[in-house]
Amino acid sequence: MPAVLRTRSKESSIEQKPASRTRTRSRRGKRGRDDDDDDDDEESDDAYDEVGNDYDEYASRAKLATNRPFEIVAGLPASVELPNYNSSLTHPQSIKNSGVLYDSLVSSRRTWVQGEMFELYWRRPKKIVSESTPAATESPTSGTIPLIRDKMQKMCDCVMSGGPHTFKVRLFILKNDKIEQKWQDEQELKKKEKELKRKNDAEAKRLRMEERKRQQMQKKIAKEQKLQLQKENKAKQKLEQEALKLKRKEEMKKLKEQNKNKQGSPSSSMHDPRMIMNLNLMAQEDPKLNTLMETVAKGLANNSQLEEFKKFIEIAKKRSLEENPVNKRPSVTTTRPAPPSKAKDVAEDHRLNSITLVKSSKTAATEPEPKKADDENAEKQQSKEAKTTAESTQVDVKKEEEDVKEKGVKSEDTQKKEDNQVVPKRKRRKNAIKEDKDMQLTAFQQKYVQGAEIILEYLEFTHSRYYLPKKSVVEFLEDTDEIIISWIVIHNSKEIEKFKTKKIKAKLKADQKLNKEDAKPGSDVEKEVSFNPLFEADCPTPLYTPMTMKLSGIHKRFNQIIRNSVSPMEEVVKEMEKILQIGTRLSGYNLWYQLDGYDDEALSESLRFELNEWEHAMRSRRHKR
């Protein structure tokens, strides 16, 4: 339990029963409620200031502890050794009648509320009310409250547990000009980066669109070139076919003329059966003619042989005309079959040969006609193939044109969609949205995620606000959502601060002598911040007391702010180890919870009276609420 160290005074002359004292009651007049905090402040004053600041009574109590086995420390009977009630007290009172236990709890709570273990940030000045002082003089005092409120912003309300006590406290974030300026610079930088990113994205999008258009144009040009090439090939093929057709026609005309010149008699004479029979008879009689006929039939005859064979044909024609005039009908052969004979077989062979010969001669004489027919068939086939090829080419060209058109339409639609594209909203679950909203910090709180200074205020005593210990160890309990803060209170901190100031001034003077030109304006402040007097050899011995408190009811979204509001863990641990190494821990006192009914009657009465006053002040405060 923290105790306020006071000067112990002992006097030889003591009074067994001090004079009766009258204590001024707290004012219970009607007050205005212009501000809820002001009302709470005045009520909290009645509970703590009026009783707790009466140090004259502590001095009077010290007189009552003369020649007693205990001393008066912070208005309470205490000793370094453990109390021995049986040997020291003749008529020991009960714990309830002594009032030490209850008054010690009030004193301990007052010590916490008055921030003996915290660094003071602000304290409201007391109002001095008198008949000569007009009411208008209170305006400057009342004006300081809004000024203080403008310098900080509420973070949250929570419950603080310290020792055996539980307090309702309020945490504030102290405004810092450096952090505000840094935040503003970061926001401007983010804005510039965002604007630059937007421009880069727009430029990249424009380049992509241009590249896409260029590729589409290249594809379109390639398609057009392909179609033009196909058209040119088609026209070229058509011209080649027409030229080939004309060439063949000219060749056919030449062949016809040649055949007309070569062919003397009509082709119908070659089919005269009488002439063929006469020719076969002539071949039977003339072996030379038979050989010539065979040569002509095989197609091995030359021009002279053909001319000679034509002469034999003319002779056979003349004989047929003489034997078979126009008015005479040809003789009809008997249909009765005759027995086969060798001569007949020979005659049949000659007849077949003659027929073959006639066919060969007919083929030779009328050669241009089948060639012409073959050429016409070939031309028809080629024209059909050309037509089919042209039709298929035309169909392919039409398909390609349709594909190009469809791709153009699709690309235009895609381009329009990209231009008018709307980013679809993500569908998120309601629980996730609610959790995200709960975890969101305000714009002001986001500025102080790093390096915030937390201010603490007791709701039951709003006249003062204190710094949360900067050099402390913060531990987060995930199971109970509680925060444990541990730090070391140095009781002779003023002495150490004086030593620090003296050392800094000495170092600055030495540095100015050595480096006058290199001196910078902000170097003094940096040295003052970085300098730690505890690590100096001649540092005063720190008198310390370790402290621990627990905060509960803080939303986890503020954990990051609280974690980063204290100094780094390595630095804090290093300083704590140094304090434990060179410092002296203050020993605690043992309270005497029982007093003697006769020897300590006045002390017991004083403790009970103070306890009643405190209870009355708390009761009136609850009643007004």
Swiss-Prot record:
Which domain of life does the UniProt lineage start with? Eukaryota
Q: Where is the composition biased (Basic and acidic residues)?
A: 194-214, 221-234, 342-352, 368-388, 396-420
Protein family: Belongs to the SWC3 family.
This chain belongs to the protein called SWR1-complex protein 3
Q: Which keywords describe this protein according to UniProt?
A: Activator, Chromatin regulator, Nucleus, Transcription, Transcription regulation
Amino acid composition bias (Polar residues), ranges on this chain: 261-270, 353-364
Acidic residues bias (residue ranges): 35-53
Q: Where is the composition biased (Basic residues)?
A: 20-31
Query: Where can this protein be found?
Result: Nucleus
Can you name a GO cellular component term? Answer: mitochondrion
Q: Which gene encodes it?
A: SWC3
Q: Where is the signal peptide?
A: none
Q: Which GO terms describe its molecular function?
A: ATP-dependent H2AZ histone chaperone activity
Which Pfam families does its entry note? Swc3
Oligomeric and partner information: Component of the SWR1 chromatin remodeling complex composed of at least ACT1, ARP4, RVB1, RVB2, ARP6, YAF9, VPS71, VPS72, SWC3, SWC4, SWC5, SWC7 and SWR1, and perhaps BDF1.
Other remarks? Present with 1380 molecules/cell in log phase SD medium.
Q: Where is this region: Disordered?
A: 1-53, 194-234, 254-273, 324-434
Q: What does this protein do?
A: Component of the SWR1 complex which mediates the ATP-dependent exchange of histone H2A for the H2A variant HZT1 leading to transcriptional regulation of selected genes by chromatin remodeling. Involved in chromosome stability.
Q: Which GO BP terms apply? A: chromatin remodeling; endoplasmic reticulum organization; regulation of DNA-templated transcription
